[in-house]
């Protein structure tokens, strides 16, 4: 019987047509495209749809083996190396930010000190106009330079912002009080300058009015303290920083050398016990195998001995049978000989009983 898609040969083998082969190939391609693709940053497919690991540069035969490859030793080592390289690159970048803020803070302080010295030079004779100008400058100062370090603080980490938030609030609360005190100190100076004449023989010039610093400098000092605290933590200290190993371990918040040695000794003893148990189990297994081999050898020897005994018994039976046959034959021969002897004696007696003359005549 023949069909449209396939035929059968006289031998019974099935011959597939070209159309059916094409249909099967299309189904296979559709199944291969519909299979689940691996969604991973390290998974990579080539033009033929073959899966490979971009991190290890190794091909994976199928999607079912991807999880096995991810849990493998080589892939985990590559991932750990990648994480370590990322941590090493992020470390120096975060460490450079506090140094830049320190430099900016010191530059701001030096500039303020220069301004204070410059303002202290011409104010040898205090006046109402100078004091009022200083007060106006002091009131306007917090609003202008306070913007100098704000972008730097936007780039800091969230933890530093939370830690310095309370101190910033306290400093902002104290600023109005300081301005009020300075205003109250400046008002008596104005009254005294109006009442008393200028003394040309006064060798001690009046001190320059206190100009309140802006909040940016206080913020820089707070940030500098936070950076110094972070640099002075136990994580920044290298191993062996202190001569005393116990103090060094206590500061770095690790186990003391003695405790570490005890811990290592306990681990060593535990490992030795495990090795001893394994070796004892191996020796016991070998002894058991040797005992079984000896028993098998003894059993084989016993079987061989039983075979030899059976052979000897069979040979003994054969010899006994042969001996019996020989004895019976001998007895028969004796009986025949006795019969022959008796016949000879009877004939001899017959001859002797006859007359000799008759005997001679017969001859």
Swiss-Prot record:
Signal peptide (UniProt feature, chain positions): none
Subcellular location: Nucleus; Chromosome; Nucleus speckle
Chain intervals with Basic and acidic residues compositional bias: 104-115, 165-184
Location, primary (coarse class): nucleus
Any GO MF annotation of the entry: nucleic acid binding
Keyword Phosphoprotein part of the UniProt annotation: yes
Compositionally biased region (Polar residues): 90-99, 189-205
Biased composition (Acidic residues): 152-164
Modifications after synthesis and translation: Phosphorylated in response to DNA damage by the cell cycle checkpoint kinases ATR/ATM.
UniProt KW keywords: Acetylation, Cell cycle, Cell division, Chromosome, Coiled coil, Developmental protein, Metal-binding, Mitosis, mRNA processing, mRNA splicing, Nucleus, Phosphoprotein, Spliceosome, Zinc, Zinc-finger
Domain of life: Eukaryota
Tissue: Widely expressed at low level. Expressed in oocytes from primordial to antral follicles. Also detected in somatic cells of the ovary, namely, in granulosa cells from the pre-antral follicle stage onward.
Coiled coil feature spans: 16-40, 303-331
Zinc finger (C2H2-type): 53-75
GO BP terms, alphabetized: blastocyst growth; cell division; chromosome organization; intestinal epithelial structure maintenance; mitotic cell cycle; mitotic DNA damage checkpoint signaling; mitotic DNA replication checkpoint signaling; mRNA processing
Reported consequences of knocking out the gene: Mice die by the end of preimplantation development and exhibit a dramatic reduction in the total cell number, a high mitotic index, and the presence of abnormal mitotic figures. Mice appear unwell with significant loss of body weight and rapidly decline afterwards and die. Mice reveal major alterations of their digestive tract including a distended and filled stomach and an intestine lacking spontaneous peristaltism. The small intestine exhibits a thinner wall, less abundant and stunted villi and highly disorganized crypts.
SMART domains linked: ZnF_U1 (SM00451)
Modified residues (N-acetylalanine): 2
This protein's GO CC annotations: chromosome; nuclear speck; nucleus; spliceosomal complex
Biased composition (Low complexity): 129-143
Database matches in InterPro entries: Matrin/U1-like-C_Znf_C2H2, ZNF830-like, Znf_C2H2_sf, Znf_C2H2_type
Positions bearing Phosphoserine: 216, 342, 353
Function: May play a role in pre-mRNA splicing as component of the spliceosome. Acts as an important regulator of the cell cycle that participates in the maintenance of genome integrity. During cell cycle progression in embryonic fibroblast, prevents replication fork collapse, double-strand break formation and cell cycle checkpoint activation. Controls mitotic cell cycle progression and cell survival in rapidly proliferating intestinal epithelium and embryonic stem cells. During the embryo preimplantation, controls different aspects of M phase.
Assembly notes: Component of the XAB2 complex, a multimeric protein complex composed of XAB2, PRPF19, AQR, ZNF830, ISY1, and PPIE; this complex binds preferentially to RNA. Interacts with XAB2. Identified in a pentameric intron-binding (IB) complex composed of AQR, XAB2, ISY1, ZNF830 and PPIE that is incorporated into the spliceosome as a preassembled complex. The IB complex does not contain PRPF19.
Protein name: Zinc finger protein 830
Organism: Mus musculus
């Amino acid at each position: 019987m023949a069909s449209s898609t396939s035929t059968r040969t006289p031998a019974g083998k099935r011959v597939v047509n070209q159309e059916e082969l094409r249909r099967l190939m299309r189904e296979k391609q559709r199944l291969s495209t519909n299979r689940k693709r691996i969604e991973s940053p390290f998974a990579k497919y080539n033009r033929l749809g073959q899966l490979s690991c971009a991190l290890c540069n190794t091909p994976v035969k199928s999607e079912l083996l991807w999880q096995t490859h991810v849990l493998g030793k080589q892939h985990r080592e590559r991932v750990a190396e990648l994480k370590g390289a990322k941590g090493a690159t992020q470390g120096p970048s975060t460490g450079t930010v506090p140094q830049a803020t320190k430099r900016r803070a010191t530059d701001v302080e030096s500039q303020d000190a220069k301004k204070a010295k410059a303002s202290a030079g011409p104010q040898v004779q205090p006046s109402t106009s100078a004091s009022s100008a200083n007060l106006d400058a002091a009131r306007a100062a917090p609003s202008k330079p306070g913007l100098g370090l704000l972008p730097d603080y936007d780039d800091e980490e969230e933890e530093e912002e939370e830690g310095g938030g309370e101190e910033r609030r306290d400093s902002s609360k104290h600023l109005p009080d300081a301005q009020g005190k300075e205003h109250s100190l400046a008002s008596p100076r104005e009254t005294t300058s109006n009442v008393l004449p200028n003394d040309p023989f006064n060798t001690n010039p009046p001190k320059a009015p206190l100009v309140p610093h802006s909040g940016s400098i206080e913020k820089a000092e707070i940030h500098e303290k936070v950076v110094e605290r972070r640099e002075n933590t136990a994580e920044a200290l290298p191993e062996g920083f202190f001569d005393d190993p116990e103090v060094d371990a206590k500061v770095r918040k690790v186990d003391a050398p003695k405790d570490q040695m005890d811990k290592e000794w306990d681990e060593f003893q535990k490992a030795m016990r495990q090795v001893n148990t394994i070796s004892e189990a191996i020796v016991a297994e070998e002894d058991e195998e040797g005992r079984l081999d000896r028993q098998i050898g003894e059993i084989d020897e016993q079987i061989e001995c039983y075979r030899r005994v059976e052979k000897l018994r069979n040979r003994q039976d054969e010899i006994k049978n042969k001996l019996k046959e020989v004895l019976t034959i001998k007895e028969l021969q004796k009986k025949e000989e006795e019969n022959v002897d008796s016949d000879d004696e009877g004939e001899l007696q017959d001859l002797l009983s006859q007359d000799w003359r008759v005997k001679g005549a017969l001859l």
